[in-house]
């Protein structure tokens, strides 16, 4: 199945501790069915001191979310929408179901 959410898309989180937050997809992991969204699902990792990082300490980073837990933000309204594929001018494009707007990318 084709990827409906791609890197650079603006998405809305549908469930979980970050429900309702919006952010840009920084990484798409289609084999795992997950996406990484900027500023969402931030976790803290305790890092030991190493030669590259002699200080060590706490590292905050975004963890992947299941793609089913996010929805693309409609380009017109900013609300969550589903995505469908259509052929326009001989090219396969992604279209927001709610508004019918073509999605970039």
Swiss-Prot record:
Keyword Transcription recorded: no
PROSITE patterns: RIBOSOMAL_L24
Alphabetic keyword roster: Ribonucleoprotein, Ribosomal protein, RNA-binding, rRNA-binding
Keyword Nucleotidyltransferase: no
HAMAP family: Ribosomal_uL24_B
Function: One of two assembly initiator proteins, it binds directly to the 5'-end of the 23S rRNA, where it nucleates assembly of the 50S subunit. One of the proteins that surrounds the polypeptide exit tunnel on the outside of the subunit.
Encoding gene, per UniProt annotation: rplX
Subunit structure: Part of the 50S ribosomal subunit.
Species name: Sphingopyxis alaskensis (strain DSM 13593 / LMG 18877 / RB2256) (Sphingomonas alaskensis)
Lineage: Bacteria, Pseudomonadati, Pseudomonadota, Alphaproteobacteria, Sphingomonadales
GO molecular function, one term: structural constituent of ribosome
GO biological process: translation
Single GO cellular component term: ribonucleoprotein complex
Gene3D superfamilies cross-referenced by the UniProt entry: 2.30.30.30
The protein's name: Large ribosomal subunit protein uL24
Protein family (similarity comment): Belongs to the universal ribosomal protein uL24 family.
């Amino acid at each position: 199945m084709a990827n409906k959410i791609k890197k650079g898309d603006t998405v809305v989180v549908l469930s979980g501790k970050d429900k309702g937050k919006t952010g840009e997809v920084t990484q798409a992991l289609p084999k795992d069915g997950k996406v990484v969204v900027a500023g969402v699902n931030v976790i803290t990792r305790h890092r030991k001191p190493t030669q590259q990082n002699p200080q060590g300490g706490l590292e905050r980073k975004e963890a992947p979310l299941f793609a089913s837990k996010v929805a693309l933000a409609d380009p017109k309204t900013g609300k969550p929408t589903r995505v469908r594929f259509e052929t326009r001018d001989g090219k396969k494009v992604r279209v927001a179901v709610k508004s019918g707007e073509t999605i970039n990318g």
